[in-house]
Amino acid sequence: MTRILLLLLRFYQYFISPLLSNNCRFHPTCSEYAKEAISMHGSIKGLWLTFKRIIKCQPFCDGGYDTVPISIKNSKPLNKKI
């Protein structure tokens, strides 16, 4: 499922997105955010994070720099015991 979603996103980025105006209020763009979220968190949680991001894409939100949250189980401890 993850592979299919990433292929659909790539198709969108190469064939559909260039036809639309570039007025995304966030960095990275929503499609880049979706690719990163799905790659990091899997299809279900990645789609949920993407949905929440797209909901924020409206005139009452300032936008700006918004990255995919890091998964706790995928992160490495910052301090090691010696």
UniProtKB/Swiss-Prot annotation:
Could be involved in insertion of integral membrane proteins into the membrane. It is found in: Cell inner membrane. It comes from the Bacteria. SMART domains: Haemolytic. Keywords: Cell inner membrane, Cell membrane, Membrane. InterPro entries: Membr_insert_effic_factor_YidD. GO terms for cellular component: plasma membrane. It is a peripheral membrane protein. This is Putative membrane protein insertion efficiency factor. HAMAP family: UPF0161_YidD (MF_00386). Belongs to the UPF0161 family. Pfam families: YidD (PF01809).
